[in-house]
A protein has these predicted regions:
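Compositionally biased, non-globular sequence tracts
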Residues: 47-58
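Compositionally biased, low-structure terminal segments
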Residues: 4-6, 24, 39-42, 58, ...
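Glycine-centered helix-coil hinge/cap
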Residues: 66-67
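C-terminal charged interaction modules
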Residues: 70-117
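Short N-terminal mixed-charge amphipathic segments
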Residues: 1-48
Length: 117
């Protein structure tokens, strides 16, 4: 079997809307930031007001799915920290599983390991 490039697009489905996320180094960085958001939520969640915490989650969601995605996802809904946490966690878990499947493929060059990018 020869070398081949794999599909680097993960499709995230939220409320029947599909968001295409391209696997690249910047995505890994944004996922690490999302993980930090989870940690800060656990540490400071009860100290912040709901709007501030929701805004943090919205920025994290937008950084991964694209600007305005969080507003579209939560349009017409009351601010709810747990809903935002659940959506961001779902996105994080889906992308982590996607990256794991890419890394397990044989004869595939993941972009994060390509020294020419």
């Amino acid at each position: 079997m020869g070398f081949r490039f794999n599909d680097r697009v993960c499709v995230i489905d939220i409320n029947d809307v599909k968001y295409s996320v391209t696997f690249q180094k910047a995505l890994v960085d944004r996922l690490n930031e999302a993980r930090e958001t989870f940690g800060s939520f656990k540490a400071d969640g009860d100290k912040e007001n709901v709007s501030e915490v929701c805004a943090v989650f919205d920025r994290a969601i937008d950084s991964i799915l694209g600007v305005g995605s969080a507003a579209a996802i939560f349009a017409g809904r009351f601010e709810n920290i747990m809903e935002r946490y659940a959506v961001l966690r779902y996105i994080y878990d889906e992308l982590t599983a996607f990256m794991k499947s890419i890394s397990e493929e044989k004869n595939v060059q993941p972009e994060t390991e390509n020294p020419h990018n």
